[in-house]
Amino acid sequence: LTLDTPAAAVVPEIGAKGVLAGFDEAGQPILRQAKRPITLRHLLTHTSGYAYDMWSADIARYRKATGTPAVGTGRNAALDLPLLFDPGEDWSYGIGIDWVGKMIEAVSGETLSAHLSRVLFDPLGMVDTSFKLRPDQRARLAGMHGRGPDGALAPIAFETPQDPEFHGGGGGLYGTARDYLAFARMILNGGKHGGLRLLKAETVAEMARDQLGPLAVRPMRSSVPSATNDADFFPGMPNGWGLTFLINRKPSPQGRSAGALAWAGLGNTFYWIDHGRGTAGIFLSQILPFFDAKAISLFRDFETMVNAP
């Protein structure tokens, strides 16, 4: 795989729907051909044009009009979506990483689960990270909770499909804080884990480089309130994207260095990796919708305390 080779050379079905240009009077989608092919770099930087329906009213409308299943179903048809814009022309957080998972499977000849275990989880000692729950993991599984209109939390049923048609590169792993911190420390240490080197230092440097150029990460506006609130990690601040991390272009109010790496998971799980300060932090909860005000406040307070003089 190379970053700028057309992805269709590996997964021919990618981008087949073209770009969503609007809807006709009957509410059916109007599609056009994209101006250029999607590359791996587009997918990793969320500039491919793909979007999640929870942050795109147009994709949510398309999915409803066409009967396309949700990504969370684990069905291959869920990835058969149009683009919001021509590749490379804007930023939208979406299913591009799921397509990267498909590319990895195509070139490795392994399932995504087997490949990640071999090259990442096993070398890092991430013994509790997997797509499918073992019985001993299920016994320790933290339940998901929903935040109601009154602010109270209540248990809700939530589980990713255990035998899906595809494992999502963009989500679906179970794990622990200890496991994920092993990954974060490896990135913080320039690709090394103890005496083992998993990634070249120059690879990590490229991963940590802002790839967006004149583009920028924009606030994510919710179109599915049950899944996510509006999300803006650094209000009023410019942000970029690496391979594949959120990058704050200026120092944050929490003391995070400019150029640090971060991202999150749907259940209000958050992390940062700050090469400037030499720190990394993990915050895990199991709450929906995403970007819960109390959870993000606790995460910010946690980072502020870590960075305090």
Task: Annotate each language-model stretch with its function.
Residues 271-272, 278-288:
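Short, well-ordered beta-strand elements
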Residues 254-262:
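Short, hydrophobic/aromatic-rich segments at coil-to-beta transitions
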Residues 150, 276-277:
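Residue-level recognition of short loop/turn positions
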Residues 287-309:
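Generic C-terminus detector
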Residues 260, 267-276:
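Short, surface-exposed beta-strand/loop micro-motifs that present aromatic residues
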